[in-house]
């Protein structure tokens, strides 16, 4: 009988980095900056990956990657702007920004129970022929905004409810975050009725709410999302051609068996990784620990683990501040600490 001994042929190399950021967006901007730096050093995008515990963890990063013109493919979930429920919420915001947006009107009207294509067409026709004419100076003053939303008593009650909600948040002095908050309150019953996995989708929308907090105007938000008017519930992710270079975004489950030169593991934060639910049993916590091991062993040369130090979790009502228990306490001889300022 022979004794088995495990060893590595690789020697030397740099220490993994543990990077703390003040906010989620600061974490995202740091990762984008490092991706660009590694690319300048000769590491191709296809040799880099960003890994995360849950699909919604990449949403803020996806916006920053889009702004930086970094192409990416996502595995283990839809891209942020390709999910039907996020497109729904953005449609409400698009209408507040541009009341002539027929595609967005059709989208949100058809979400209403009892409203079919014929009713939606009548409402949209009235909007284009009568209301827009009443408020040609829609963006210039609150009085113009009031004119646009006046006199809709002839609409069905469920459509009036939509108009009431939009009227209450149409004023230009209301922030995108506040507008989004009221839209989500209105939309939540629709979400529950339309999707069996509404709890999972609600987390996506909570993340979207957090993202809107840093914007002062809806047009800035829509520009960063780089959205065309949404006309489909789901957009297919195009497969890259043989000459296309792209960054990989992936859930850890989808990254098993794969390796990259450079790997970022984001949201190494108590409540995110491990998740709050995993604390219920030892078995679930061990599964989380195993996933962290899988994530960290995907890197061949460079491993960067990041976490934001102050984020609000809508589901639990907690403010998450502690680094993941899986990395806390690791000595500086094994993990190089960095702070983003």
Question: Which positions does each model-derived feature cover?
Answer:
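An acidic site on a long C-lobe helix of protein kinase domains
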Residues: 27, 31, 85, 155-158, ...
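Short alpha-helix plus adjacent loop in nuclease-associated cores
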Residues: 75-97
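Acidic, low-complexity intrinsically disordered tails
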Residues: 335-341
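Helicase P-loop NTPase motor core
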Residues: 1-71, 96-98
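Structured loop/turn residues at secondary-structure junctions
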Residues: 23, 53, 77-78, 213, ...
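Active-site-adjacent beta-strand anchor residues
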Residues: 21, 51, 75, 82, ...
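Well-ordered alpha-helical segments embedded in enzymatic catalytic cores
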Residues: 27-34, 88, 207, 291
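Conserved helicase C-terminal RecA-like lobe
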Residues: 44, 58, 62-64, 90-333
């Amino acid at each position: 009988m022979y004794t088995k001994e495990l060893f590595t042929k690789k020697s030397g190399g740099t220490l993994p980095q543990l990077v703390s950021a003040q906010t989620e967006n600061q974490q995202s901007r740091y990762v984008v900056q490092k991706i660009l730096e590694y690319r300048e050093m000769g590491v191709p995008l296809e040799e880099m990956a960003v890994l995360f515990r849950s699909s919604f963890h990449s949403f803020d990063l996806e916006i920053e990657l889009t702004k930086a013109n970094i192409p990416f493919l996502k595995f283990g979930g839809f891209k942020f702007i390709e999910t039907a429920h996020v497109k729904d919420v953005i449609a409400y915001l698009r209408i507040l920004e541009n009341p002539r947006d027929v595609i967005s009107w059709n989208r949100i009207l058809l979400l209403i129970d009892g409203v079919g294509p014929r009713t939606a067409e009548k409402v949209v026709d009235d909007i284009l022929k009568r209301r827009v004419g009443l408020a040609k100076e829609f963006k210039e003053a609150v009085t113009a905004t009031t004119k646009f939303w006046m006199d809709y008593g002839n609409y069905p009650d469920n459509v009036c409810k939509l108009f009431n909600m939009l009227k209450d948040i149409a004023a230009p002095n209301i922030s995108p975050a506040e507008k989004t908050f009221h839209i989500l309150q209105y939309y939540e019953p629709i979400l529950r009725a339309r999707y069996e996995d509404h709890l999972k989708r609600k987390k996506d929308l909570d993340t979207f709410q957090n993202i809107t907090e840093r914007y002062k105007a809806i047009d800035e938000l829509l520009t960063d999302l780089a959205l065309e008017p949404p006309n489909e519930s789901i957009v297919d992710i195009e497969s890259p051609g043989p000459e296309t270079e792209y960054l990989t975004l992936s859930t850890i489950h989808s990254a098993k068996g794969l390796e990259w030169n450079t790997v970022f593991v984001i949201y190494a934060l108590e409540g995110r990784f491990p998740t709050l639910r995993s604390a219920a049993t030892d078995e679930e916590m061990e599964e989380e620990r195993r996933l962290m091991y899988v994530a960290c062993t995907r890197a061949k040369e460079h491993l960067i683990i990041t976490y934001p130090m102050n984020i609000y979790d809508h589901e639990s009502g907690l403010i998450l501040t502690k680094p993941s228990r899986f990395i806390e306490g690791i000595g500086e001889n094994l993990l190089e600490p960095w702070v983003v300022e």
